[in-house]
Every structure is written in structure tokens, then in C-alpha cells.
């Protein structure tokens, strides 16, 4: 699913870009006001203190987790 987004979000650099400036799946609209991001740190205070290293770690986690807990990843609260 991440590879079908525009722009593709199936690599760490693309996910870091998304964490800084999130857009809709088609890439046309900014969703920063409704999604935590560096761009919306005034709305989401926890984003204020994140460094680029933190963002790369988060993106790496997102890329790795489906391989670790494949059926649970992205399944929401039903698995917990």
C-alpha cells in the first residue's frame, strides 16, 4: 500500500518526508492539520522535540514492523 501512494512511501527517506509534511494518499493535499507532523508541531506538541534522527528511527520502525508482526501491524486495537 505504501508503494502505491503518491509519492511512494515505501522507503525510509520517503517516510521521513511524510513525517515532516504529510499529504493525502494521492499527494495532492496537505493533511498536516489532522496528522501529527513536524509541519504541525504547533498543534501536536510532541512533534516539537523530534530530531531528524528520531524521524529516521520512527520511519525505520514503520518499515520493519510488518516483517516482525505481519498480521497485527496496521490492524488497529483489535489485536491488543
Curated annotation (Swiss-Prot):
GO terms for cellular component: chloroplast thylakoid membrane; photosystem II. The keyword Transport applies. GO terms for biological process: photosynthesis. Keywords: Chloroplast, Electron transport, Heme, Iron, Membrane, Metal-binding, Photosynthesis, Photosystem II, Plastid, Thylakoid, Transport. Binds 1 heme group covalently per subunit. One of its GO terms (molecular function) is heme binding. Heme binds at residue 47. Its main location: plastid. It comes from the Eukaryota. It is found in: Plastid, Chloroplast thylakoid membrane. It is a peripheral membrane protein. Its cofactor is heme. One of the extrinsic, lumenal subunits of photosystem II (PSII). PSII is a light-driven water plastoquinone oxidoreductase, using light energy to abstract electrons from H(2)O, generating a proton gradient subsequently used for ATP formation. The extrinsic proteins stabilize the structure of photosystem II oxygen-evolving complex (OEC), the ion environment of oxygen evolution and protect the OEC against heat-induced inactivation. Belongs to the cytochrome c family. PsbV subfamily. PSII is composed of 1 copy each of membrane proteins PsbA, PsbB, PsbC, PsbD, PsbE, PsbF, PsbH, PsbI, PsbJ, PsbK, PsbL, PsbM, PsbT, PsbY, PsbZ, Psb30/Ycf12, at least 3 peripheral proteins of the oxygen-evolving complex and a large number of cofactors. It forms dimeric complexes. This is Photosystem II extrinsic protein V.
